[in-house]
Each structure stands twice: as structure tokens, then as C-alpha cells.
């Protein structure tokens, strides 16, 4: 190493810091987002940002993200925040990609949760009686209370969503309870009535005794529950099987209360069955010695164990293909004079020999598969003289009706959701009849209502359905095979699903789903606004009268759906037909039908939503796009109901793209729960750190899967944000000295600037493609890596000397400022959809005379043309050499041989002549931030520093020779050459003269 350079005496050192072009900006280092963001929201409101966005986008192709409506009940939670932020990023990025991306928020307003709240807060807590909905005035008054409650929470949630930085038409949101919406929902229902797919049927539905309503699949969750289980004997009666005359088919069930509704036994043709004989059993046992039992071979041993049978033998095999001719008696035959009917055996694909007996007790009024098997065989059963009418054995209160002789009034579940006395009553009757083989208890997963958290039952009820497999009629004519299921499956195949796995998921649901139950027996909703009369076969004829329908729709438009429940509504709407025997249906529509119709009263309503109502999608010969975006549970929710509603009335899906996100868990991967204390409230994150932190967290995660959030994850997000903000702040401060009139043309720029623009071009392609593909984590990862590694740690670090110390006239300095201006412009625009507040604050400092908001700009265009792959390849070599030099400098600094890298003058040994030629015209001192350097084509000393990743390069760090420049701190032998400024280099002396010429004292 060379000798240490001579240091100047302290008394001789001048302070040139004021002559440096250091960054200057009012953009603060500390973000202060919780205080600053509300000011930015006010600014957006003051400039009319939403309206300006619409004006800027006029005439563009439309990309509309149609809002899946949150429920107007309670404050928003972290799932709401994730969902709304994603929607906002989609909307803003599509707008900046050149589309007209208009976001109209909406709310789901009807339904049971609000009814529950009103009943609880306005009635139960006050000791008041729940309204009698048979009274028109009471019904209308209750509905007004529900409307007021929903309105309150819409206003609360609206402000919470706006605080997240969501830009949309908050002054004109859609609401499923608005009068135009209720009118259109009624019209949509009438379309199903007109095309022949709406019908009143008898079918088992999931029923909540506590809530007194049918539940959709999306409203049911499975929880642990302990059930009674029984093994029951059904005596064989069919004369064709004389050999089995004394035998019994054994079934197993965990719902003994459904046995009064039993009408068949299902078996599988794929299972091996046998006839078994009990050869020994305890005297007090329900299974008796000599009993002949028909069982699946694979389950016989377990059944006899449960029945406490000591020994048994298999009498004979019983081929499954002989079972469909077997008929049995009901085990309660003769009980209270009932159950005097034949119980046939029917083949069913749902039967297995994993558990039970290999036979499934089939009560078509209490199970979906039971119903399907029964109806699939209905014609054949009727030909055999078997009545296929499905009984109504259980009423809305969970009590047995007179269709269950001997058990009338017994409760399956009581009003509190507790197990009633029905099971024990049925079991006792079975014991008395000698038909119980065994009993026990089983803890298993059982369906519960997602609201009341109480168990539900399947019960046969009159409900309104939309048929999935009936040919759809148009003007009285139906095309064979043109069913709702067929239409929906086709629509799925021509929709873009993000991620693609969503297609298989919803396809499977549609392919296998039953008819769509759309009725609820509640008060707060849009009524099933049709009139019916009873037919002789027990079905309902729906009035098809366009004048009546128009009268209803017009009334709803002016007065809301309350008009249906007012005194005199029947006579008002029927008009001259009021004398006929038409009855008004008082059931309401399922809320999924409400929200499934939003496309009709938002995307197609030119009067109330004029900027959305003129959408012309590709399926209609246009170029506009509609996206739906919700959580993955909406494959069976809003995506599902919207698809069925639109396919049934318009023959296509209401959307072109469907994007789904996962659920939010705590940082340990657990479901959030107040009882666990692991919830993350968006309001607290905003108060502590700001909405931009939440926005960055959302976009940095893989939203397609379940995401995690918690203190440590937020801490890491804040650190990522801090680095991004610091880079933006440095660029803004540096550009304080930039004059647009001094821009440097690309061809005149140094290689380093052209290299950075090449890198910018690469990221431009990545970012645009990622935004177009809704891949926001790639946007964040790409820009964070670019800003931290390529800019802050490489380019900015190298160029600080040029930017701070070069004379104002320096071409290199002007080129660097021109480049940073381009970088800052692109980065602020690219980050705008994500860091909406931060980038807008920065934009107004960066471009004070341009657009008043970064959100009014487009993503930068034509950057891709700045690519220079040849230059990038050259600089890959240079940067490899820099890595070797940096490694050597770090060792010397650790050994305290040097402090700053400017104290060094590395000697770089290069063995490869091609590499040597590449380095020939490169100032490696500038690139490596040293005061000098030397490149040698010779053998390096054994002690030289080497990197395995950079073969052929070795580095020896020597001390820089010369005097330390008092201004730039570089060590140079040229210090002192300028007599006017003898303590600085000639470069710095020229800068000082130019400063002096500007009137600055130096």
C-alpha cells in the first residue's frame, strides 16, 4: 500500500457544503400518513377528482369493475379493506393503462342479518313484541326500520372505504334497497316467470328453525355436533323374495327424527351384500337370536358389534342386482294408524360401504340426495302403485305435523336451536315396535346457520325455485336443451378466470347444483311479486299478465317494494282481475337473487348510471370489459347467483373476467377471531401507520391465496414503504436543481444514463404486463428491487458525486438530472394505483404545473424503445468487476485500513483480453466510487481479493495518492492546480466559479 496522503490543517479547511447541489425538497422524510392522508382526500374532493377522471376518459374503451356489494351492517373489517383496495388498484391501473375505468360502489341492503338487528335492538332489548307481519301497517313500519338501519351503516362504511383511498362515485352508489333497484329485481323475477323456469315446488331445503327461513348453501357452515344414531330393521314384504320373507334390511342414520318421512331405502349395485343370521345374543338385547338381517359384507362385523351380537353367520350372498325388486314395510307400520305403505329399494350412486350398513334410509323430504333418488324413480314407482307424494312431516317451527302420525307437536329443534324431543319419541316407538337394532351417539360435522350458529335441518317446504334443467321458453317456444344449466356452463367456458382454477371450481358447482331456491319467509327484502292460483295437482299457476307486471314495477319504482305489503295491494295491482282467484305471494327473494341482479339495475341502467349503462361488451359486438372481483367463497355466492340470473334472462354471463382473492389470516396462519385476540382492524392500522401501508400490504401479497397480516408483517411492510419513500424523496430533492430546458437528448447521454433507461424500459414492460394481468405483487417486487438495488444502491450512489459536485454546466450532471426526471415520472405513475396518497403528494411537488393529480395521468408510453441489450451486456461485465472491487473494499474497511471508499485506489487485475477491452473506456473510479483506479493485464498477487462469481478478476486495494479535495472529498494529485481554489480539484474549482457567477459567495 502507498503512504497515507497528507492531511490539510484544520485551519485551512473551508466549508464548501453550501456550494454543493444537495437535494432540497419539502417532501418530508417522515411520512405522517395518518395526518397527511385526510388532507389529500380533501384535496381530491376539492378538485373533483372523480369527475375529472370521467372527463379525461371520455370516449375510451371501458373497463368496468362492477362492485360486489358488501352488506350494510357494521364497520368494515380487514377482509373488506383487502377487497376494496384490490378493486381500487384494478380501477386506477386500468384507467392509467388507457381505459375508462369507472367504479361505482354498491351495498347489499336486504336480508336476515338486518332483520335480526332490528328485532334485537328495537324489540327484544326493549321488551316489545315482534311485529305481526300479517298486519300490513306493521310490516311496512318494520321494513322502514330496516331501511333506516341499512342507510346508517352505508354512511359509516362509505367514509371508512373512502379513507382507504378508494376513488369512485361515492355520491351516487347503488343500493339493492333503492326504489329503481327493487323495481328491476322484481322485473328480473318476472322474466323467469315468463320463460317458464320459475315454479313453486315441494323440496327439502336447509331450514333454520331459529331464523324461520330457508338457507342457501352459502349461508351454511359445518361445526362439530353430537347426534343420536340408530340401526333400524325394515321387514322385507315383497312376495318375489319368499326366501327373505323373515329378513329385514338394516339402515343406519344419525337423524332418527327423519324416519317418519322415510319412503325408500337406497342401495348401491357396486356393493357386495349378504343375508346374515344372529346365532347368539344376550337375552335382553334388541337383536334376537334367529334374526335374519341384510347387510353389506364390508360392514356386517361392525353392525353386529354395535348390536352386541355374540355370534352370527352368513347365510347366503345377495347379489345387488336382485335388490331393486325388494320391498319392505315401514318399521313404524301400524303406529298410531299410520305408515301403511310400501318402502321400495332404489339404486343410488351416493351409497357406500365406508360406514353404516350399506343401505341408506331415504326420506325425500329431508335430504337432497334422498329427493333426487326418489324423483329419478318417480315414474316407475307410480307404475308400481307407490304414491310418490312427498310428505310435509316437519313444520317451520321444527315440530312434527299430522303427516307424521303419532308424533304431532314433537320438536326436532326448539326456538333456541337446542335439540328437541323428536328423536327420543321416534326411538321409543321403534323399540316398542321391535324394530330398533342398536343405538349410539356420534360427534361429527353438522350444518349450522352462519348467522345464528345453530343447527339446521332439511325439511320439505313449499318454496319458489328456478329450474336448472327445464328448457327455457321464449315467446312460448322452447329450444330443446336450452336450459339454465347449459347456458351457465357455456358462459363459464368463455369467461376469463383469475386465477384459472376458479373455472373448474364454479363449473363443478353449476354442473351438480340442484334447482335454485330463491324464496325466503321473511320481511325485509324484495317480494316474489307474482300472483298465483292453486291447480288441481297441487302446483301453482303463475299469472302471466304484462299489464299487471308493469303496474307492479312502476309502483316499486315510485314507492319501493313496500307497495307490495300495503293495504289494498292485491286489488291495486290486479286491477280488473281482482275478482279472479289469484293470491298474492308474500315470500321475499333470497338476497342472492337481489345481488345477482345488480348487473341489470347498475350496468344496464342508462338513467341512474349513465356512464355505465352504455357499456357494449365483446359478447354484444363491442370492446368494453366487465370484471367481477370478490373472495373465493363467492364462487358459490355472488359470482354464482349473478351467472344464473344473467344466463337465465340474457343467455350469457354478466361478466367477462372474474378475479378471486383468498381470505385474511393472522401472521401465524390462523383464522382471525376476537376470542383469540388476533384480529387486525383496518381502522387501527390507518390510525397508526396510514392507509398506504395497508395498500402496500395488499399489493405485496399473493392475493389469490390466503394472506397473512399481523404486527411483524406490518412492520416489514412499513420498512418496504420507508425505502420506497426515501428513494422518491431523494429524486424529488435532486430534481430541485433540474431545469427542463436543459434536458439532454438520449443520444448525447453517457453510457450509465443510457443503461438506467434500458433498465427502466425493462421494468416498463414488466409493470405494464403485470398490471394488465392483475399481478400486483410482481409490480411491487419489481419496483422495490429496481428502486433499492438498481437505483439507490447503484445508480444514485455512483451519480451523487456528479450531481452534487459537478459545475451547473456539466453535460454529465444535466444528463443525470434528465434521467432522474424520467425515472421519477415513471415510478410515481407506476406506484400510483398502490401508494395512492404518497405518490399524489409527491406528484404535486414533482410536476406542480402539470395534471393536478397523478391519478389523472397515464402510465408512461414508449419507454420500451429505450432498450439497449448490447449496452446492458457490456455493463454486466463492468458491474461484475464492480462487485469484485466492492468486496475488496469491504474487507479493507473491516480491517480499518480505509474509512471511506474515496481513500482507495484499487488495482484491478484482468486476465481476459475481451474483458480488458470492455473496461477500456470506463471510468472505474467513478463506477466503484473510489478516488482512482488502475487496470493491469498481468498475474495478480496470491493475496489479491477474488470472487468465485467473477472469474478472471482480482483486486488489490491501495491507498489513493494525493490530497483530499475540500469540496468533493476525493483524493487527487490535481488538488492545488487551480491557484484561485488551491484546496479543491480543477473540476470543483470550475463549479465554484460558476457558483460565484450566480452570485453565491464561496
From Swiss-Prot:
It is found in: Cytoplasm. L-isoleucyl-5'-AMP binds at residue 630. It is an enzyme of class 6 (ligase). Keywords: Aminoacyl-tRNA synthetase, ATP-binding, Cytoplasm, Ligase, Nucleotide-binding, Protein biosynthesis. GO terms for cellular component: cytosol. A motif ('KMSKS' region) lies at residues 671-675. Gene3D superfamilies: 1.10.730.20, HUPs, Valyl/Leucyl/Isoleucyl-tRNA synthetase, editing domain. CDD domains: Anticodon_Ia_Ile_BEm. The keyword Transport does not apply. GO terms for biological process: isoleucyl-tRNA aminoacylation. Catalyzes the attachment of isoleucine to tRNA(Ile). As IleRS can inadvertently accommodate and process structurally similar amino acids such as valine, to avoid such errors it has two additional distinct tRNA(Ile)-dependent editing activities. One activity is designated as 'pretransfer' editing and involves the hydrolysis of activated Val-AMP. The other activity is designated 'posttransfer' editing and involves deacylation of mischarged Val-tRNA(Ile). Belongs to the class-I aminoacyl-tRNA synthetase family. IleS type 1 subfamily. This is Isoleucine--tRNA ligase. It comes from Bradyrhizobium diazoefficiens (strain JCM 10833 / BCRC 13528 / IAM 13628 / NBRC 14792 / USDA 110). The gene is ileS.
Amino acid at each position: 500500500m502507498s503512504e497515507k496522503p497528507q492531511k490539510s490543517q484544520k485551519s485551512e479547511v473551508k466549508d464548501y457544503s453550501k456550494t454543493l447541489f444537495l437535494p432540497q425538497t419539502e417532501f418530508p422524510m417522515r411520512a405522517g400518513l395518518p395526518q397527511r392522508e385526510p388532507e389529500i382526500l380533501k384535496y381530491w374532493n376539492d378538485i373533483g377528482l372523480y369527475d375529472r377522471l370521467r372527463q379525461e376518459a371520455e370516449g375510451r374503451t371501458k373497463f368496468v369493475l362492477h362492485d360486489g356489494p358488501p352488506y350494510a351492517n357494521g364497520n368494515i373489517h380487514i377482509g373488506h379493506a383487502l377487497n376494496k383496495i384490490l378493486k381500487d388498484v384494478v380501477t386506477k391501473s386500468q384507467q392509467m393503462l388507457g381505459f375508462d375505468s369507472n367504479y361505482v360502489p354498491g351495498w347489499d341492503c336486504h336480508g336476515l342479518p338486518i332483520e335480526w338487528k332490528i328485532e334485537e335492538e328495537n324489540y327484544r332489548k326493549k321488551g316489545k313484541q315482534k311485529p305481526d307481519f300479517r298486519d300490513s301497517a306493521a310490516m311496512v313500519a318494520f321494513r322502514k326500520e330496516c331501511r333506516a338501519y341499512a342507510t346508517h351503516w352505508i354512511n359509516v362504511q362509505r367514509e371508512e372505504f373512502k379513507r382507504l383511498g378508494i376513488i369512485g362515485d361515492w355520491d351516487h352508489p347503488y343500493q339493492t334497497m333503492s326504489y329503481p333497484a327493487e323495481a328491476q329485481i322484481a322485473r328480473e323475477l318476472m322474466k323467469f316467470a315468463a320463460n317458464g323456469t320459475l315454479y313453486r315446488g315441494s323440496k327439502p331445503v336447509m331450514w333454520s328453525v331459529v331464523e324461520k327461513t330457508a338457507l342457501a348453501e352459502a349461508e351454511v357452515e359445518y361445526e362439530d355436533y353430537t347426534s343420536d344414531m340408530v340401526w333400524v330393521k325394515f321387514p322385507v314384504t315383497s312376495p318375489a323374495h319368499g326366501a327373505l320373507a323373515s329378513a329385514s334390511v338394516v339402515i343406519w342414520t344419525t337423524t332418527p327424527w327423519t324416519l317418519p318421512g322415510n319412503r325408500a331405502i337406497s342401495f348401491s349395485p357396486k356393493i357386495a351384500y349378504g343375508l346374515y343370521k344372529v346365532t347368539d345374543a344376550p337375552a335382553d338385547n334388541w337383536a334376537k337370536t334367529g334374526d335374519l338381517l341384510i347387510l353389506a359384507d364390508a360392514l356386517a362385523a361392525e353392525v353386529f358389534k354395535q348390536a352386541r351380537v355374540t355370534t352370527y353367520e352368513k347365510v347366503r350372498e345377495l347379489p345387488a342386482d336382485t335388490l331393486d325388486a325388494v320391498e319392505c314395510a315401514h318399521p313404524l307400520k301400524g303406529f298410531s294408524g299410520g305408515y301403511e305403505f310400501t318402502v321400495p329399494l332404489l339404486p343410488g350412486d351416493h351409497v357406500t360401504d365406508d360406514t353404516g350398513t350399506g343401505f341408506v334410509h331415504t326420506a325425500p323430504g329431508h335430504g337432497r340426495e334422498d329427493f333426487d333418488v326418489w324423483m329419478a324413480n318417480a315414474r316407475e314407482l307410480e307404475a308400481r302403485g307407490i304414491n310418490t307424494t312427498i310428505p310435509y312431516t316437519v313444520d317451520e317451527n321444527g315440530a312434527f305435523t299430522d303427516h307424521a302420525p303419532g308424533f304431532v307437536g314433537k320438536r326436532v329443534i326448539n326456538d333456541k336451536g337446542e335439540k328437541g324431543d323428536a328423536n327420543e319419541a321416534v326411538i321409543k316407538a321403534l323399540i316398542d315396535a321391535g324394530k330398533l337394532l342398536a343405538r349410539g351417539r356420534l360427534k361429527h360435522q353438522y350444518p349450522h346457520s352462519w348467522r345464528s350458529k345453530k343447527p339446521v335441518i332439511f325439511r320439505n317446504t313449499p318454496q319458489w325455485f328456478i329450474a336448472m334443467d327445464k328448457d327455457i321458453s321464449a315467446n312460448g317456444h322452447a329450444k330443446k336443451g336450452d336450459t339454465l344449466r347449459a347456458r351457465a356452463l357455456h358462459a363459464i367456458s368463455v369467461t376469463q378466470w383469475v386465477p384459472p382454477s376458479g373455472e373448474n371450481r364454479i363449473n363443478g358447482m353449476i354442473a351438480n347444483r340442484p334447482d335454485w331456491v330463491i324464496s325466503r319467509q321473511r320481511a325485509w327484502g324484495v317480494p316474489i311479486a307474482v300472483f298465483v292460483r292453486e291447480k288441481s295437482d297441487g302446483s301453482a299457476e303463475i299469472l302471466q299478465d304484462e299489464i299487471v307486471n308493469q303496474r307492479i314495477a312502476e309502483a316499486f319504482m315510485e314507492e319501493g317494494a313496500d307497495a307490495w305489503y300495503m293495504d289494498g295491494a292485491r286489488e291495486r295491482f290486479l286491477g280488473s282481475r281482482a275478482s279472479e282467484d289469484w293470491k298474492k305471494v308474500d315470500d321475499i327473494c333470497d338476497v342472492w337473487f337481489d345481488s345477482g341482479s345488480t348487473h341489470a339495475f347498475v350496468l344496464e341502467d342508462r338513467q341512474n348510471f349513465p356512464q355505465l349503462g352504455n357499456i357494449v361488451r365483446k359478447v354484444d359486438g363491442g370492446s368494453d370489459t366487465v370484471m367481477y372481483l370478490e373472495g373465493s367463497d363467492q364462487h358459490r355466492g355472488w359470482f354464482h347467483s349473478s351467472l344464473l340470473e344473467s344466463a337465465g334472462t340474457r343467455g350469457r354471463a354478466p361478466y367477462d373476467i372474474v378475479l378471486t382473492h383468498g381470505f385474511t389470516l393472522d401472521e401465524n396462519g390462523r383464522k382471525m377471531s376476537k376470542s383469540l385476540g388476533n384480529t387486525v382492524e383496518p381502522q387501527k392500522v390507518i390510525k397508526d401507520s396510514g392507509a398506504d401501508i395497508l395498500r402496500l400490504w395488499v399489493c405485496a401479497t399473493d392475493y389469490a391465496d390466503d394472506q397473512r397480516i399481523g404486527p411483524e408483517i406490518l412492520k416489514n411492510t412499513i420498512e418496504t414503504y420507508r425505502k420506497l419513500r426515501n428513494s422518491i424523496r431523494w429524486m424529488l430533492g435532486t430534481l430541485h436543481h433540474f431545469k427542463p430546458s436543459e434536458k439532454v437528448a438520449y443520444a448525447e447521454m453517457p453510457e450509465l444514463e443510457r443503461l438506467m433507461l434500458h433498465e427502466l424500459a425493462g421494468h416498463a414492460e414488466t409493470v405494464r404486463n403485470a398490471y394488465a394481468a392483475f399481478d400486483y405483487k410482481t409490480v411491487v417486487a419489481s419496483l422495490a428491487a429496481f428502486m433499492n438495488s438498481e437505483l439507490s444502491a447503484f445508480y444514485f450512489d455512483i451519480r451523487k458525486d456528479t450531481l452534487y459536485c459537478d459545475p451547473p454546466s456539466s453535460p454529465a450532471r444535466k444528463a443525470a438530472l434528465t434521467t432522474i426526471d424520467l425515472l421519477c415520472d415513471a415510478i410515481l405513475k407506476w406506484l400510483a394505483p398502490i401508494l395512492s396518497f404518497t405518490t399524489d403528494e409527491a406528484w404535486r411537488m414533482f410536476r406542480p404545473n402539470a395534471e393536478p393529480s397523478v391519478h389523472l395521468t397515464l402510465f408512461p408510453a414508449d419507454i420500451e424503445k429505450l432498450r439497449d441489450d448490447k449496452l446492458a451486456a457490456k455493463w454486466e461485465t463492468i458491474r461484475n468487476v464492480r462487485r469484485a472491487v466492492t468486496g475488496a473494499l469491504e474487507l479493507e474497511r473491516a480491517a480499518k485500513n480505509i474509512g471511506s471508499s474515496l481513500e482507495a485506489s484499487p488495482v484491478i487485475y484482468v486476465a481476459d483480453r475481451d474483458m480488458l477491452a470492455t473496461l477500456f473506456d470506463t471510468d472505474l473510479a467513478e463506477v466503484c466510487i473510489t478516488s482512482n483506479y488502475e487496470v493491469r493485464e498481468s498475474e495478480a498477487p496470491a493475496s489479491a481479493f477474488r470472487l468465485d462469481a467473477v472469474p478472471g478478476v482480482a483486486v488489490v486495494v491501495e491507498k489513493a495518492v494525493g490530497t483530499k479535495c475540500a469540496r468533493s472529498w476525493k483524493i487527487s494529485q490535481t488538488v492545488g492546480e487551480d491557484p484561485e481554489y488551491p484546496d479543491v480539484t480543477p473540476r470543483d474549482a470550475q463549479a465554484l466559479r460558476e457558483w460565484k457567477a450566480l452570485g453565491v459567495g464561496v
